[in-house]
């Protein structure tokens, strides 16, 4: 069976090399809106999606993430846009909800010709005092945790062909 959605799922790859060119507002809004259509437990829509294009704030996020990772390189691979997903610490489905949002946004990005890569360590970043200050500056409520982020932009190179899926990846029990 084949259709546009299944084709996009099979073709999307994590990209780790980005052009410096900023994406358009229309492209950004398309990706962000796709995230809002992700399923959330009990339909709560509690996560927050924060797109950062301000160069100074992006630099701060890169530094925070790199410090947690213990590297000096850019954990966001030079992407001009960083999209952060946060969820209430009190929501038992927060990580699941935020993960679905990130997945939908990655698929949407691919479908309109953008590149993305899931980035980790936002949990540690936004548990820190520096992260809490950023959330306050962004007028977000207290009690949020970082779920993950996307490096988002135009690919400067494309990955090699994908390896085949392992044969025992799924099982059908009848």
Predicted regions located by residue number:
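Acidic, surface-exposed loops and disordered segments
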Residues: 1-174
